[in-house]
């Protein structure tokens, strides 16, 4: 197994060399607004009524492109911080094995892989590989938390307007990343022009990303093209596993994008096949987003496990290192800091 992984990494070094951070925006404003609107409009009747009002639907739609509004040169630190949230290069991420659910474990695994395979260290920097499923999970959990608060306030006959505003913001914010996850070029090192061996002669220019997700959508795709292609409501089991499966299906369509582009499918009015494919991708994003909204609402009713600090493992009366009670107080020794090259 270790030998196989070494071969895979060697091939990636040959094929991809230095991998840059994608700078293209997902779907463009129009595509993101379509995804968010359709998800909000298709909520079932047992979802909270305030989420199904025309004003709420309009707000969720408006917020679809919100994270792209944070990618302005006027706010360079914000832009740099959240740019990797829009994509994940699965060919690189999968080199660490099964993706852990925790963002920081993922970062540590990428760092360890870079130490083991120095030639890949630059390409395996976390901001180059991307955090797409991590930001999605984290915003989904924010939404679920706010929905739990809404349930509690409603049960106590208290004012729910503030938490309703929070829920709509999280719902709109979540929609952006779920939408990005339906765009194949947001899941691959082949994000903006084919790199490495290219026996099929796919484009290597750096315009395919915007040509597909923005220019073509703006000119040729409308809500009415997408809505009929949405799938029926699906019950989400484990949201992390289901979302990764969704990303992997999206990734399986990367070459299809390049094939359509080679056939001039995204030029001007494009081809019927390209229009159908693009509408299907947007519909997949809207369907998954709706399903995640419903899952957050259903799971917000589940009891929250209580944390009992006294239940943490103890040693000589103190919390064991590694427990939540101890983590914030752990300080590396000077010797360890020196070994890490941090002095």
Where are these regions (language model features)?
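Bacterial N-terminal signal peptides that target proteins for export
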Residues: 1-11
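N-terminal, motif-rich segments that launch catalysis or mediate targeting to/interaction with membranes
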Residues: 24-173, 184-283, 290-343
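Bacterial N-terminal signal peptides
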Residues: 9-20
